[in-house]
């Protein structure tokens, strides 16, 4: 890598199934990885020798299903006992265990059993995206803007920020995916300055968001947002997989439910069929020797695929109705409906949406896979003062809190302090009091959600306000102050007004939340893994170099014309040195140094022999 540090910040779309990275240097560029792909699978694989990230990890998933991790975004910031986690675990080939209420992934790596938090797995993908950018820019990248689903809660946002820290990035801002896509759309060619209401429909591999924005000049104001952090292409694949599984069982009497390799191969075939059906109306699915020597073959029509996923497709319209209702805007007032996310290529999804908007033409001018990273890179340039163009220098983003924030009151009633769709950053206050006479401590449990009963919302954390002067119940005035920053992350303070006593928390004691010590430890571990990866690559390279040199010398020695020019003694010496080099290649865990020494030794003998011909 060239010297120096990149002054700007890269934009990373950290996706459930694929990730994408962009940079801004006078204009936005989506950066391709070493395979030439502009999106990289969010996969990490562990083997007895090495760690693989991206395409290399996904390509070997069928051979190593138990140690190939994906869908980390469906675990990040969640509790182990959450229903979605429990359901997903039934479909994942890798093992997820409960560590103090948080889900942790367990794999075999370098011959040992290792545990990784979802933040660590995500950090490995982020590191890969950072390296892809560095290879293109030729400088070290230190700063990034990372995107999350608009509907991510506080815990999921903080955990994503932590993943960035573990990967060694300074995360300048966490921004919402649909908002980032709106920037890409708003800066697109031929867009006028006229005011417009734009609905962003973002259906990706694992998450779904709908955001309604008002765009005027360079000001992007999010009016409302809704979604489902557990709906996307993976779910359509799962429904297809179940259909194919029962089809195979019907035809052969064989059940592949417990065979991780067969399931991975069939899922890959299902994903391919789904993609194909976006452009044709019928396809054939074939998997040779799927299980017990039996081949799998089935034809699938687009209509059948739509039928299998009808309920899920239909459910995408609920958040659309919700954002219109929350923003108090009728559907006829929406100027553009913009499609984002790979799953919006599905014709049925497009038809349902177009029909909902009375046959409206959908806006497909932006690349659904790249728009989010594009917008993040623009925001990165603005935050680092690198945006030079007229259209970006006045750009202002006003986003919202996706879910209401508040405290638990007596009887488990949820007292809302920050209503959902409040523009952030924001500070909101609400006063509370005591429920018992002479009560000197009040506990403040902080929740996020929309239900009246606290138990049905997400508990973000709790803290105590102590040393309240003893008074009659209802007399003390306790003020809760909620501060939400531009990342959508919350800090809460409570103050007793007569004494000024206060207690505060940046929500950090929730299950699975990493302390700064945890993050530091993981950063060091990440460095160790990187060093191990590099050492493995060097060893592999040294071994390959030795192998190819040995092969070329063997060719020389066995070639009658070339070998006849060698003196008898020289030929014997070369053959002896070759035998030593081959012995070095046979060593099970040969080191880089051993391979290098063997290569140098062989070269020395060969050079001497050749020069004395």
Swiss-Prot record:
Pfam families with a match to the protein in the record: HSP70
Renumbered residue ranges of the record's region Lid domain (SBDalpha): 516-612
Region (Nucleotide binding domain (NBD)): 1-391
Keyword list, A-Z: ATP-binding, Chaperone, Cytoplasm, Hydrolase, Nucleotide-binding, Protein biosynthesis
Binding locations of ATP: 16-18, 73, 205-207, 271-278, 342
Motif Nuclear export signal: positions: 574-582
Paired cysteines (S-S): none
GO biological process: translation
Subcellular localization, as worded in the UniProt entry: Cytoplasm
Location of the region described as Inter-domain linker in the Swiss-Prot/TrEMBL record: 392-402
EC number: 3.6.4.10
Superkingdom assignment: Eukaryota
Family: Belongs to the heat shock protein 70 family. Ssb-type Hsp70 subfamily.
General function of this protein: Ribosome-bound, Hsp70-type chaperone that assists in the cotranslational folding of newly synthesized proteins in the cytosol. Stimulates folding by interacting with nascent chains, binding to short, largely hydrophobic sequences exposed by unfolded proteins, thereby stabilizing longer, more slowly translated, and aggregation-prone nascent polypeptides and domains that cannot fold stably until fully synthesized. The Hsp70-protein substrate interaction depends on ATP-binding and on allosteric regulation between the NBD and the SBD.
Protein name, entry field: Ribosome-associated molecular chaperone SSB1
The species this protein was found in: Nakaseomyces delphensis
